[in-house]
Amino acid sequence: MPPGCTTDCVTAVADGGYPEVFNNESVDGSFGVTSPILLDTITPSGHTMRTLDVPSGPNGDHLVSSFSSKSELGLNLSTNGSALTFMGYVAPVGAVDVSNSNTPGVVDPTNPVGESFYRAVAELHGNGSFSYTETNAYSGNNGRAAILDSADNKLFMSGNAGNGSNPQPVGVIAGAGAQLTTPSTLPESEQQVGQPTPMGGFNITALGDKADKVGKDDNFRGLTVHDNVVYLTKGSGGNGVNTVYFIDTTGKACPSGVGLPVPGAPLPTSGLSYNPATLQSTGLPENMCVLAGFPTATKSTTSFPFGVWFANDTTMYVADEGSGSNTYDAATGSYTDAAAQTGAGLQKWELSDGSWKLAYTIQSGLDLGTPYAVSGYPTGDNPVTGLPWAPATDGLRNLTGEVNPDGTVSVWAVTSTVSGATDEGADPNRLVRVTDHLDATSAAGDTFRTLRTAQSGEALRGIVYVPGQ
């Protein structure tokens, strides 16, 4: 391993059994195994009504996930609510290290994974049919979410790129972060896939900080559109700022890197213009801002935003996935760093006096840092890490919500985990729900309820509320 390697190849330390197979990450940092994607339709209380298998066979259009890539498969409705979108890989089930492979049109020769696979956006239409749009973006890493702008027939995407040495190739830098493309109506086998089209760029030099690795400031996870503005989050990686961003299509919102969207600004309709000759040294042009009030500290160890949901123009909820630290205390039987976090969970932010302010964070019921049992999952300790297999909640990732007639909001989210697994993205996680009052000033009385715990061999990723279903 990795597949296709020519130098520095390693030997697997575990066979294909779950979850032990992911111990191979201890010798292969790119390790992952592609898996089928299942879409569950559930009631607000968590009852599963039906399950739809996303086509994953080799004969015809198909898409898979890269289990255990925990940042993937964000679900979003199109801007007019007519289609559901998400991202995956055009690869067979059971393929290894696909999430760190190159894309066919953007090959980094220093990437240790010597294989290439397109990333693709899947659209699920109201009649139950799928269509797919392949892209060369996110070479070396993963596309995480997509939203269809129905009015202009454009796809907005978020993700990360690069799995090789520095400086990264031009195509990798241009194919990172916030991307834009036009949906295809052709079968995957007939699509002519061009070069990536970046629609947003951010550089920490806009905040007065010293430049770091070009392309890695644009390592985005969450993606949403509200009031004609594209918002993205960054919550991981050793570069840049973990915070909430928006794309400024006016060039006037944030002369110093921080600001608020300009009222009436249009959504992006075209990609950024950039000079390939200088991209490796200067990065993409900057047209993104840190949302005023959100963190601006580089390489944060306390802020890990993922999903964003707006209840209205002045109230937004942000899922913080936690630090990922699996420091464990055998005496108390808990993951102490996870349990001690104050920002992990569901953050409620309110806009006032030209800036967003954190009102409070809802954690009750998440049992941060407390291990839980999963039927069929190993007990005891993982011999590779010496820590318990049992996962514990570390925070929240993707989320969705609905404003209720009585002035409350219901928020559903999937959890992040810590454990003794070598790759915690392979942990069975949970779907949780909480009710909050829009006019509340504290989290008193707000408690999460677990609606579903993933089974052994399963991971929960995206969640979206579909009105009227």
Regions found by a protein language model. Give the residues of each.
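Sequence/structural signature of beta-propeller domains
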Residues: 1-469
